[in-house]
Design a protein with these regions (language model features):
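A domain-level signal for the structural core that forms small-molecule/cofactor-binding pockets
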Residues: 1-105
Length: 105
């Protein structure tokens, strides 16, 4: 059962129409999880409440995904592919570049 905490920085640019549901559906597909087993908790953080040492680059609004999952793939390659699929799914749903999606697993 995957559980994801998704934090959007500077979130007003992302349409909120059923965003948590769209993320849950996309993550379920990306992870190959059975229907009804992927949970998402969505957080929005104002860009003023986010910082990087030395200052965040202009226009960079990251998305952080903290992912708990039982039964990760056994090989490093398969796990990497799974994490890439998660980042790509979140980027697509949120309309952010995949390079700005950070998956913590």
């Amino acid at each position: 059962m995957p559980i994801a905490d998704v934090t959007l920085i500077g979130a007003p640019d992302v349409p909120s129409d059923a965003l948590a549901q769209r993320l849950a559906d996309a993550l379920s597909t990306a992870l190959g999880a059975p229907r009804g087993t992927t949970w998402v908790r969505l957080h929005r953080v104002d860009a003023r409440d986010y910082a990087e040492d030395g200052g965040a680059p202009a226009g960079v609004l990251p998305v952080f995904v903290e992912l708990l999952r039982r039964g990760w793939p056994s090989t490093v390659e398969e796990r990497g592919a799974s994490l890439r699929a998660v980042a790509e799914a979140v980027a697509r749903v949120c309309g952010r570049p995949v390079a700005q999606v950070h998956v913590l697993a």
